[in-house]
Amino acid sequence: MFFNNASGFEEGYAKKDNLEIYYRDYGPVGGIPVLLVMGLGGQLTFWPPYMIKRLQDSGYRPIAYDNRDMGLSTRFESNPTFLSNYLKYYLNIPIKSEYKLDDMANDAVMLLDYLNIDKCHVIGMSMGGMISQILVANHPDRFHSYTQIASMVSTPNPTNGPSFRVIRLLQERAFKNATKEERIDRAVRLVSTIGMKGYNHNTKEFRNEVGQSIDRSNDDTGFILSLIHIWR
């Protein structure tokens, strides 16, 4: 994880009806737009600053945003439980949710329209890769290319989904009474479990980055909603 403190960007809200999507347009205005779609539980600040700079130096205009229910974007009121919905997912019982990944893809289109961008490249990470697949499938004329990072092309199921150890760590993220330090410890355990083996994530830099993301947006309730949309 990297907390992106890159300077010189334009930021604001793309608005439609009761929905507000918070974005950062890193520029330059004359660059070729690249839409960055973050994954499950991630904020726009998670995109590495060196990646932003490399894109800019290569003539591109990176644009990142917070998915709904994440970061500074609109929050939805429903409060689903992790365990009951995971059991439905595991038993192949239909899951109800307030919106779908298709709606999250429409949020990205709304942002492009707001910024008057007719066509761009798109890069999606994890759940953002799933959202981006829907984007390019439904709006092929709006994208030059599509890059998928650490994602998949189908809905995960109990045979190819996360291990029970990862599921347990994800479930802990739904605990509302966790302290900031407990949340930082949990992030270290999660990234150590799913990240590159042998790499030490429990560093002062990483812990500071997680702490900054918590300070930016202290509400983790949208994480469960997003996870349900992947299971649905």
Predicted regions and their residues:
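Short glycine-enriched nucleophile-adjacent loop
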Residues: 129-140, 146
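Conserved alpha/beta-hydrolase catalytic His-Asp/Glu region
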Residues: 181-226
